[in-house]
Regions:
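Juxtamembrane/disordered regions of integral membrane proteins
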Residues: 1-136
Length: 136
């Protein structure tokens, strides 16, 4: 295996690991909040308050996931953070398209739009944290 192949492999691994970290944190938090009764049972409509909370922790976890991608990157940490963010952006668009007007159990339209809007700024913040860490 050449040095370039190793670098590409590490880059792909960094982005995937960062994304998995963000998704895992989100899913665990979702389950905990459902079990605690702060969110309604699965498949039931969710009001604005819990969705605002979900938006806030998803934003925080997107920053964490992007930071992980940047931290594990072999070089260009911001680029890796933004790639992870772009994938999140695309997945958020796909989720919005798939659930738009599908019923109240998917929440109001502002929620998927918010997830789309925050994806890239959160990725930038995660990458920026890593850049600041590298500068000392």
């Amino acid at each position: 295996m050449t040095a370039v192949q190793r670098s590409v492999g590490r880059s792909v691994g960094a982005v995937i690991t960062g994304m998995v970290a963000g998704v895992a944190l989100t899913l665990v938090t979702d389950v905990v909040l459902h079990k605690a009764g702060l969110f309604p049972p699965w498949g039931q409509p969710v009001s604005d308050g819990p969705l605002a909370l979900a938006t806030a922790y998803r934003a925080a976890f997107e920053v964490v996931g992007s930071y992980v991608a940047a931290r594990l990157a072999p070089d260009r940490p911001m680029w890796h953070a933004m790639v992870a963010g772009f994938v999140g952006f695309v997945v958020s668009i796909a989720g919005a398209v798939a659930t738009w007007n599908r019923g109240p159990e998917f929440g109001p339209h502002w929620y998927p739009v918010a997830l789309i809007v925050i994806a890239l700024p959160c990725a930038w913040v995660g990458g920026r944290f890593r850049e600041m860490q590298l500068r000392g």
